[in-house]
Amino acid sequence: MAITAIKGCNDILPEESGRWQYIEQAARRIFERNGFSEIRVPIMEKTELFCRSIGDTSDIVEKEMYTFTDKGENSVTLRPEGTAGVMRAYIEHKMHAQDPLAKLYYLGPMFRYERPQKGRYRQFHQIGAEVTGVTDPLVDAQVLNMLCAFFHEIGLDEPTLQINSLGCPDCRPAYRAALMEFLQGRLDRLCDDCKRRFTVNPLRTLDCKSAGCAEATKGAPAMLDHLCTACDDHFSSVKRYLDLTGSRYSINPRMVRGLDYYTRTTFELVTGLLGAQSAVAAGGRYDGLISQLGGPSIPGIGFAMGVERVALLLGERDFSRRPDLFIATMGAGQRDKAFCLLTKLQNQGIRVEMDYEGKSLKSQMRRADKLRARFSVVIGENELATGRASFKRMEDGVQNEAALEADDIVTLLA
């Protein structure tokens, strides 16, 4: 019996990888345009990192992490999200000593044990960005605009930006008390998870996908009505900067996010094209996370997007990489010339294919069609003798003659 992939872990096959490369390359362009640098961190971390950052009572830590004990009796976890590992590296390598302001981005796989569904898997991939060292709301607006710019870059203007503020440690306790008072008489209508959340993290009841909980929490107090003056001013400034740049957004007072480290600005990009699980990107400010992980008191803000979900939004677009040229030969005597041309053209950045097995000309041209090559050329004895050949544009059959020299062919293909 053949071995298959683990449930919820998918292979990205060649016909799909072009779509992923398109997404990743667009993200790199946007990030680097905004002054961000790439950081790469391990996919495994000490379990304590996620317990301290995400929160012991979060669904991720309690139910979804892939955690194991290694041969050295250390508790190790496959990363369920990217921010904690990036901040661990920021602290460990004392990046803050050089400059507290860091603008970092990352790409890579994450792991959560949850029920696989459309666009959501046990191994999934995220692209994320983090900014440290600045509390100014202008940075929040830049991060939000950068995220929206990415979706515009890949031709997706449908996802809409939703924002909220979760306040700070000064104003959140009063809101927590008000929310608990509201929920007290509705506990019997909450799901079992939310009954447990009521005492440990009541804000998470607002994020529950259960229809019963959504109904029970209708009319719940809003965090926006309980912000301290500093947080209210901060959120007003974020909105003002977004308005200044003409950014489209709406306020979602029920947005709380699933990670415990968020403070003040939180946000999601949502779409109606993926069913109930509508967020394709999300993030927020985490001003206490770095100190919580043992570093200095330095603020931060960031986001992550799910690559699988973004790929779904791109629909049926064709991202395959077509060869620029297919070189066919009439016989073994012309293969040396074809191979030399192939090598020289590839070294000049041209995508070229040829037959490797001495197949018939008919078979070679069928392969050129299958690969959807832009041009084809047939090298026979006459072409070899004259040093010239006709290059056929495959979409309409138009032929142009050129010398069998790399520079001439590059000019013709341009």
UniProtKB/Swiss-Prot annotation:
Entry's localization field: Cytoplasm
Chief place where the protein resides: cytoplasm
GO biological process assignments: histidyl-tRNA aminoacylation
GO molecular function: ATP binding; histidine-tRNA ligase activity
Catalysed transformations (reactions): tRNA(His) + L-histidine + ATP = L-histidyl-tRNA(His) + AMP + diphosphate + H(+)
Keyword terms, alphabetized: Aminoacyl-tRNA synthetase, ATP-binding, Cytoplasm, Ligase, Nucleotide-binding, Protein biosynthesis
Cellular component per GO, a single term: cytoplasm
Top-rank lineage group of the source organism: Bacteria
Enzyme Commission (EC) number: 6.1.1.21
InterPro entries, per the entry: aa-tRNA-synth_II, aa-tRNA-synth_II/BPL/LPL, Anticodon-bd, Anticodon-bd_dom_sf, His-tRNA-ligase, HisRS-like_core, HisRS/HisZ, HisRS_anticodon
Keyword Iron-sulfur: no
A Pfam family recorded for this sequence: HGTP_anticodon
SUPFAM superfamilies reported for this sequence: Class II aaRS ABD-related, Class II aaRS and biotin synthetases
Classification via NCBIfam families: hisS
Subunit description: Homodimer.
Family (UniProt): Belongs to the class-II aminoacyl-tRNA synthetase family.
HAMAP family according to UniProt: His_tRNA_synth (MF_00127)
Record's protein name: Histidine--tRNA ligase
Gene this protein is translated from: hisS
